[in-house]
Amino acid sequence: TQESRPTLTGVNFIFNNSSIKAVPTDSHRLSQRQISLENGPQTSTDLIIPGKSLVELSRIIGESDPEITVNPGENQVLFEVGNIAFYSRLLDGQYPDTDRLIPTESTTSVEFELPVLARSLERASLLTHESRNNVVKMTLDVQNQLVKLQGDSPEIGNVEEEIGFKNLEGEGLTISFNPDYLREALRASITDSIIMNFTQPLRPFTVIPAKQDVNFPQLITHVRTF
């Protein structure tokens, strides 16, 4: 849990001379955003910054896209944004090795337009939020080129609908997951289309941008339903 592993309340930033990578995880899901960096440090720098501090920093920045200077110290970090200086403490500890968790290959892949998937997910999860088990089931029928999303509530009933998609390939698959995790991944996405990559029904899956030049994989764990 985050209480027993304080580092999971923070975001791991890895700086080098040409890029910056930010990785948050709560052990049920993770995301990894990497962008190119100008004037990076000559030696690799690894920081764990509290999530609450980053929320406050984002409020200061707002919708603008300013130049930010990051000055790490021994126990704290200084962000300089224009004439504003923002200090945050750093978290002690070792962040999990998340690189090994993200699959490099997949057996099933489906591409969606983000708004289409988001609307279907919203409808399917209306029922699941009424039950104790907040789980939806996605069925990928490659042979018949169908994708279905199903939500159930023992007290109310179930909803099932087909989802429109742009491309579906690989092996047929049925997987269950927490719809809130996928919803938040879609909200964080920065492209109009996303690709979901799967390996096995009982393994985590990834949500990635449908653009080659955007490095932003998000990993979501499955939910066992038996």
Question: Model-derived features: where do they sit?
Answer:
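DNA polymerase processivity clamps
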Residues: 1-34, 40-91, 106-226
